[in-house]
Amino acid sequence: MRNVTIVSMVALAAVLVFLPAASAQKLELGKEPGLEVPEVTAGPGWKTCPRCQNNAHIRAAREKYKVDGHAFDPRDLSGVWGNNGIQLDIKNVPPMTPYGNELWEATQAEQVRPEIPPMNGGQGSKDPMMHCDPLGYPRSFTYNYGFEFVHLPDRVVQFFEWGGYHRTIWTDGRKLPEEAPQLRWYGYNVGRWEGDTFVVESNGFEDRSWLDQDRRSMARGMPHSDEMRLVERWKRTSYGTLEVELTIIDPKVYTTPWTTKGTVDLRPGAELSEYWCVPTDSEEYNRDLVR
């Protein structure tokens, strides 16, 4: 029998459908008064996953691994980060083009029951995630799950716990394709260092994904087109802190580029686990919603 990890997302489906695969894990309630979020322990010799830690265990890990004041190389982003994925700054989203508005309206969740307001992630959802589509990028980062950076001589690989997805950021000097030969859920990515800032440029994205759920109403998603380009600026400001600036350039959907910023924390006492969207589980859950 699977155990459910309690997460901080509003989408109920994330709690009930996408379950950790390690059946041997057990839940332990936090020790601090009022702290009801459990940690999922992984067993002797194994680390827990970023989303499985409660605040007390996060603080304990920071002390155990001496995160504060630890020496670091600003040009090394290695480590497990999150699970505090950034939310896109919806308040600063520029006006959409007519085509963008058309895409946005099409994401509206359907009203299945009159007594329940429509919400993506619930009944009548249009969220691609509810059908086990890949989250794509940048949603895999803006979502509330951990990720890991691994440096190799000619690339940096970013692994995401949700769905087991990854993206390769090439640092071997290649250029982005002017015309992507094939659209990708995680795009084509090239990176370079500008001082201590890692700059990533991307294009060629599959347009069936969302940037994020529209958190102004929760009933719609933030769309993008296959012409979207991303520019990210990653900067490690301390051993335990990673700052990111994400700029979205999509003239087909948004009238001007827009930028959002965020900070993610190192999780030295964690390692990525499995967190899959299983189509058969998802179908069963969606059927239960309308019974």
Language model region names:
Residues 7-18:
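Bacterial N-terminal signal peptides
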Residues 1-4:
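Positively charged n-region of N-terminal signal peptides that target proteins for export
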